[in-house]
Amino acid sequence: MCPTDAISGIAPDTITVEGRGWGHGRGLQQWGALGYAVDHGWSYEQILQHYYSNTTSSYVADREIKVHITRNNEMDLLVTSANPFTVEGIQFYGGQIVRLSAIGPHNFNIHQSGGCADPGYAVYQGHPGRVDSSGRTFIEAQPLSLNSSVDDLNQLLQVITCDRSNPAVEVSRRHYRGSLGLIEQNGQYSFNRVLREQYLRGVVPQETPSSWGTLGGGLGMQALHAQA
């Protein structure tokens, strides 16, 4: 059999590609909001009504929330800060690293450590921790200043993330507003306790680039406003 000749054709002037991103598909879509703002001139109110129809916006009182730090699941929590900080009332100097681990309910270890590769030495073995409203026990590190609205990174706590497959290797360091803690619930899980408004101040800039605000002669700011 002889292969058939290839059929030649002329490509169209416009090729439309339809698809979606990798998000959960619920609520506001950042790139969609940008398109409505820049290409259609929508205000942030119009964008919000499009994604959250039949709703009204209003002011709500700020409150504390606990945010699960999933990247640290079932791993020791390593915390440091440029300024002094405390763990359950125990003082640590700026630059020191504390390793927190949950052995079981009402049983936590607090070690001073040199980092991911160092198990450290015991500062408090078998700390009973505290009990939250759900009956789970936890311990918590707090910064020198409890004002979570500060922008000085030296005043914030920092999580040291170790490689899951090779725990002796440091992967990253990230600052957090508020306090950082370890909760025992059939395992050990890290959390960040912070005021909701301060949490949003840290999340929004990571989800949408600030450069969007200058797009479309400044119309992109409406997309950022909607996201915030």
Question: Across the structure, where does each feature detected by a protein language model lie?
Answer:
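Conserved, single-site charged/polar hotspot
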Residues: M1-A228
